[in-house]
Amino acid sequence: MIYTLTFNPSLDYLIQVDDFEEGKLNRTCREKVFAGGKGINVSIMLNNLHHESVALGFIADFTGRQISSLLQQRGISCRFIEVKEGMSRINVKMRSGVETEINGIGPNITSSDVDKLFGELSKLDDGDMLVISGSVPKTLPDDMYEQIMCLVKDKNIKVVVDATQDLLVNVLHLHPFLIKPNNFELSEIFGVDITTKEDVIYYAKKLQEKGAVNVLVSMGASGAVLVDETGCVHTSPSPSGVLVNSVGAGDSMVAGFMSGYLESSGDYSHAFLKGIASGSASAFSVDFATNDQIENILHSMQE
């Protein structure tokens, strides 16, 4: 089974306001509410790719219940920890020429809540996969990623980490199965300017030397690079298409990679290409890409 962990899920409220005027009454002309968070995005994409997953994390109050309900409507299993104090955050994304975002805070997660999460994680079995992604709320310890990886390290669990800076660097010694920085995040980690594919490959190998098993680096319109556990380097340009929505493209890439890895019994070349196809298909779509959209792009990449 695949498990995804989102520490601070959100109820995302996307609104379109034509000719927004600050300080005056404005009316929306289009609106949509959906469950948000990096791990949740991975679960949604896995579902689109016909893979089951279980969404873990913390929710609170009516907004949290709505997050769970929206996922269950998609057929995604949820085992969220219900927090007593506060409410799951609402993130407002307003489009009016430019996009403005206002993110909520989230609930007050206690040590007792963390213990309950650890209880859920202790139920994972050998052969399961766990995706840990996104930021850690201020009410949680900074080393949450490390604590979780230490908790499952004695089991044969493939842990995927999609995080930035110290959250990522501090778990490399625990040998995550897959990490997925983008080229800008790679630059931040090493404090250098990374401008070429050769630079990306060099520093991806540096992360591998620090303990990562597989390093997948997304480079936006410039494509992607994978340095797999055998030392083989895979590169690919980005498929051609019109960028519609970049939100969730990286999470879609993670889901696509996992899907490709599982369905090919560990073929990294196929996993890499399906990851790119999934990320690109979502970037070219208003919503997360469908399996058919992904397969069409994957087929064009393999011709």
Where are these regions (language model features)?
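Short beta-strands and strand-loop turn motifs
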Residues: 101-103, 128-134, 162, 180-185
